[in-house]
């Protein structure tokens, strides 16, 4: 009991009254404080206030559901000491630990000890979270007027805006160029011949008024572009195959 020196108030729970006074005097000498007595069979009827004792000693007793009550009776960091206990030490230590005690250990073959945590049952403590960075809130105050934005129109060149010529899209599967091979069987030779005839017909078409590109509202009745949408001056326009051909 050398570890109990300086404990002011203790509770001794006894079973056998033989030599009881002697054991109480020994406990007083070890602690240097006052010692209260309680019979193990009267413990459930007792009405001790919470945090009343610095030390509780139990001798030759087997408690079942009283360890939680003893935990409330002890002050924070109070000690529990079992002497000449009844039952397996491992089972008792597990039961004491599940009741809320800490540092549960077997001091000797006939003695067990445990402690109450250094805080009162049901108490709360304020958690210390990391402080908010005041500079982080200033990020939202940054003005976006100083940022340079990219003009979308500058991303494209004039060549990128031009539509691809459909005449140059299809190539021969054999030569890899827009030129039919000798024994063309994919239809590219016929397509190139049709484009050639259409180009000749377009070149032969002459505009006497100079308004063909403006649309049908400005075209004459014999205009080869009649029925076609307006186009830009100088833009290549492909005429239908039946234009400039006699209907008879």
Curated annotation (Swiss-Prot):
InterPro entries from the UniProt entry: Anamorsin, Anamorsin_N_metazoan, CIAPIN1, SAM-dependent_MTases_sf
Cofactor: [2Fe-2S] cluster; [4Fe-4S] cluster
Binding sites annotated in the UniProt record for [2Fe-2S] cluster: 172, 181, 184, 186
Motif (Cx2C motif 1): 209-212
Pfam families: Anamorsin_N (PF20922), CIAPIN1 (PF05093)
Localization per Swiss-Prot or TrEMBL: Cytoplasm; Mitochondrion intermembrane space
Record keywords: 2Fe-2S, 4Fe-4S, Cytoplasm, Iron, Iron-sulfur, Metal-binding, Mitochondrion
One GO BP annotation of this record: iron-sulfur cluster assembly
GO molecular function, one term: 2 iron, 2 sulfur cluster binding
Major place of residence: cytoplasm
A GO CC term assigned to this protein in UniProt: mitochondrial intermembrane space
Region of interest (Fe-S binding site B), residue spans: 209-223
Residues at which [4Fe-4S] cluster binds: 209, 212, 220, 223
Annotated motif Cx2C motif 2, positions: 220-223
Role according to the record: Component of the cytosolic iron-sulfur (Fe-S) protein assembly (CIA) machinery. Required for the maturation of extramitochondrial Fe-S proteins. Part of an electron transfer chain functioning in an early step of cytosolic Fe-S biogenesis, facilitating the de novo assembly of a [4Fe-4S] cluster on the cytosolic Fe-S scaffold complex. Electrons are transferred from NADPH via a FAD- and FMN-containing diflavin oxidoreductase.
HAMAP family xref list: Anamorsin
Summary of subunit composition and partner proteins: Monomer.
Domain commentary: The C-terminal domain binds 2 Fe-S clusters but is otherwise mostly in an intrinsically disordered conformation.
Name by which UniProt lists this protein: Anamorsin homolog
């Amino acid at each position: 009991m050398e570890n109990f020196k300086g404990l002011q108030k203790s509770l001794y729970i006894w079973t056998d009254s033989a030599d009881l006074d002697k054991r109480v005097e020994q406990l007083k000498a070890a602690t240097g404080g006052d010692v209260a007595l309680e019979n193990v069979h009267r413990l459930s009827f007792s009405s001790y206030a919470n945090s009343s004792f610095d030390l509780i000693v139990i001798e030759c007793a087997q408690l079942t559901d009283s360890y939680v009550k003893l935990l409330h009776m002890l002050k924070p960091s109070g000690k529990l000491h079992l002497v000449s206990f009844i039952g397996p030490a491992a089972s008792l230590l597990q039961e004491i630990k599940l009741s809320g005690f800490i540092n549960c250990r077997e001091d000797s073959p006939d003695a067990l000890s445990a402690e109450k945590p250094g805080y009162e049952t049901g108490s709360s403590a304020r958690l210390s979270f990391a402080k908010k960075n005041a500079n982080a809130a200033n990020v939202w105050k940054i003005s976006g007027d100083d940022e340079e934005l990219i003009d979308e129109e500058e991303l494209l060149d004039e060549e990128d805006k031009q539509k691809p010529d459909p005449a140059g899209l299809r190539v021969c599967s054999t030569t890899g160029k827009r030129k039919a091979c000798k024994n063309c069987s994919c239809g590219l030779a016929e397509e190139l011949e049709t484009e050639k005839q259409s180009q000749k017909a377009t070149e032969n078409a002459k505009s006497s008024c100079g308004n063909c590109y403006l649309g049908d509202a400005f075209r004459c009745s014999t205009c080869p572009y009649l029925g076609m949408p307006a186009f830009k001056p100088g833009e290549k326009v492909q005429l239908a195959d039946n234009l400039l051909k006699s209907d008879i």
